[in-house]
Curated annotation (Swiss-Prot):
GO MF annotation list: rRNA binding; structural constituent of ribosome
CC per GO annotation: ribonucleoprotein complex; ribosome
Record text on subunit structure and interactions: Part of the 50S ribosomal subunit.
Lineage: Bacteria, Pseudomonadati, Pseudomonadota, Gammaproteobacteria, Alteromonadales
Keywords recorded for this protein, A-Z: Ribonucleoprotein, Ribosomal protein, RNA-binding, rRNA-binding
Residue ranges crossing the lipid bilayer per the database entry: none
Record's protein name: Large ribosomal subunit protein uL24
Membership in a protein family: Belongs to the universal ribosomal protein uL24 family.
Function: One of two assembly initiator proteins, it binds directly to the 5'-end of the 23S rRNA, where it nucleates assembly of the 50S subunit.
């Protein structure tokens, strides 16, 4: 099945501590989760590793968020939207359900 949300898509968080935030998807994981820039930040306690030149300390990083908790942002309507698929010229393309415009 083709992915409704892909890398570089702008999404709106629908649930969780970052509800309402708008950001870009930086990575899509095969487990049905996404890593979204600046969303779901967690603090990781990192050990120093002198061989790799990594300093120790508390590092803030993005944790994966469930794909069902985000919706793609439609810039034409200014709201979160759903995505559908259709064939155009023999190619499968994504479109917004609210206004039938193609997703860029």
């Amino acid at each position: 099945m083709a992915a409704k949300i892909r890398r570089e898509d702008e999404v709106v968080v629908l649930a969780g501590k970052d509800k309402g935030k708008r950001a870009k998807v930086s990575q899509v994981l095969p487990t049905g989760k996404l890593i979204v820039e600046g969303v779901n930040l967690v603090k990781k306690h990192q050990k120093p590793n002198p061989q790799l030149g990594v300093a120790g300390g508390i590092v803030e990083q993005e944790a994966p968020i469930q794909a069902s908790n985000v919706a793609i942002f439609n810039s034409a309507t200014g709201k979160a939207d759903r995505v559908g698929f259709r064939l155009e010229d023999g190619k499968k393309v994504r479109f917004f359900k609210s206004n039938s415009e193609l997703v860029k």
